[in-house]
Amino acid sequence: MPTAKQAGARPERADAARNRARILEAARSLFAERGVREVSLEEVARAAGVGKATLFRRFGDRGALFLALLDEHERELQDAVLRGEPPLGPGAPPRARLLAFLDALLRLSLDHRELLLASETARPGARLQTGAYAFWHRHVSWLLGESRPPADPDLLAHVLLAAFDAELLTALQEQGRDEASVGDAIRAVAEALLH
């Protein structure tokens, strides 16, 4: 992802960076304590020691705040994909990397399911516009193409990533599906695409 300098944006002011960090920390703490849906943005602003206008100026709406909180975790996974140990990181065959990535993305999605669900319902379609989704899509598309060039790795990557939709994962959990069974199903679909 481009940095502020690369994108031509001015560097963030120190006070703005502090406010952003305080807002994210307050949101993280309140959401962990009471749940994402039970906390208002007014409460987040108050806990962060900033005005509601500052929070809205910085994030715009609830969905943008949720996406900012997810960004930290998504960057960790991106770093592991780019620089981590195999099989998730470079050095493993594409098939092994794809399966390791899908396992890691499932873990991230389940660990932060409530936040993902809130972000997807607060701003429908916004998740597909994020740099993280674009990264996941390019990575999966490339791995599919390298493993066994399918007819359309771009489309197949979207289809495979659809399995990580928070509403779907929530519904599966409510049906009693555990992480292992969902992971097995996702890997089975990936394996079928690779043969």
Language-model segments: which ranges?
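Alpha-helical DNA-contacting segments of helix-turn-helix folds
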Residues: 66-73, 112, 116
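Conserved amphipathic alpha-helical interaction elements at protein-protein interfaces in regulatory
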Residues: 29, 33, 61, 83, ...
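Hydrophobic/aromatic-rich alpha-helical bundle segments in the mid-to-C-terminal region
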Residues: 117-121, 126-130, 134, 145-190
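Basic, helix-initiating cap at the start of DNA-binding domains
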Residues: 1-34, 38-47, 64-67
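Short hydrophobic/aromatic patch on the recognition helix
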Residues: 49-59
